[in-house]
């Protein structure tokens, strides 16, 4: 009898374990990152998506010269509770690169494409993760649809004159004198050495930064005409600066809950650009992290925890 009881208990235990495994696998499958495309204004936009369809949306906007690849780990970390959407802009990552003769590579147009992306996916309300180029793209959308923005997550994304320092000196020269001669030095920023520098400068432990990052970026940047596209966007960045007062007014008027997670050693967008947010925003959580421009590469777990706690604290759920 004891033998039969033990056998019965063993069977029940195995069944319970199997059920747990099936449940875990179901959850894992539901939250796995998916790799999709959608057509926006006739352009094929590649994007990553993770999390349940009915979960609160976080729109992840990448910077220069990268792609949605920069969010790969963050999406896994947050997908249990949020729906994460990370598009590649035209000419970046795996999205289509229309010829410059047929497409306006400007920040106004990039924001228009992301706006259309949200429409295609029928996204109504959302939080935005704004990094580097993602900031001027995202702030255009936030200022246009303030009622749709649940919160802002700002990671080395600028909206103040104080944030444009030494790195921007040759770029400002390009704005003032739009010539091939002034554009040529800027190509170094997306050269193999320049890409590696962007990922490793200001990082505490460079051995933790995978070279796959800049090798993948380089693969996309070496497409025909992509160098010219990057120079066009350097020139277009000048159109963001006159909009800073408008975005700052948006902060003051609508007071979106805002999380600042900023790599304080960033040479491109230094910490001087992070502090002014505190002037205009009342509900702001502020963290300067001991890392560089691509803060997620070294501080991804820390940033994910800050985001999760911040959104739950502000009842974005």
Feature locations, PLM:
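A short, Lys/Arg-enriched amphipathic alpha-helix followed by its capping loop at the start of a domain
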Residues: 73-82, 120
């Amino acid at each position: 009898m004891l033998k039969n009881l033990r056998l019965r208990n063993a069977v029940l235990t195995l069944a319970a374990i199997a059920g747990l495994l099936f449940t875990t696998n179901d959850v894992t499958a539901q939250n796995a990152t998916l790799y999709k495309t959608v057509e926006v204004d006739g352009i094929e936009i590649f994007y990553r998506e993770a999390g349940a369809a009915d979960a609160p949306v976080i729109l992840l906007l990448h910077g220069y010269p990268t792609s949605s690849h920069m969010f790969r780990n963050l999406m896994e970390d947050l997908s249990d509770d949020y729906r994460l959407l990370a598009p590649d802009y035209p000419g970046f990552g795996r999205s289509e690169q229309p010829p410059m003769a047929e497409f306006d590579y400007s920040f106004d147009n990039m924001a228009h494409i992301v706006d259309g992306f949200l429409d295609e996916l029928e996204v109504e309300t959302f939080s935005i993760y704004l990094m580097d180029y993602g900031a001027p793209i995202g702030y255009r959308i936030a200022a246009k649809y303030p009622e749709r923005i649940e919160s802002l997550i700002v990671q080395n994304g600028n909206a103040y004159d104080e944030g444009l320092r030494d790195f921007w000196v040759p770029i400002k020269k390009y704005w003032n004198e739009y010539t091939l001669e002034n554009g040529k030095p800027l190509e170094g920023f997306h050269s193999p050495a320049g890409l590696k520098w962007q990922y490793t400068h200001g990082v505490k432990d460079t051995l933790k930064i995978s070279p796959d990052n800049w090798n993948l970026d380089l693969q996309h940047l070496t497409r025909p005409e992509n160098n010219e596209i990057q120079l066009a966007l350097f020139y277009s960045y000048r159109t963001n600066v006159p909009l800073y007062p408008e975005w700052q007014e948006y902060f003051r008027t609508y007071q979106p809950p805002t999380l600042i997670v900023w790599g304080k050693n960033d040479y491109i967008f230094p910490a001087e650009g992070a502090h002014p947010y505190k002037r205009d925003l009342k509900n702001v959580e502020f963290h300067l992290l001991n890392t560089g421009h691509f803060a997620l590469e070294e501080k991804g777990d820390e940033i994910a925890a800050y985001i999760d706690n911040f959104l739950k604290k502000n009842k974005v759920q």
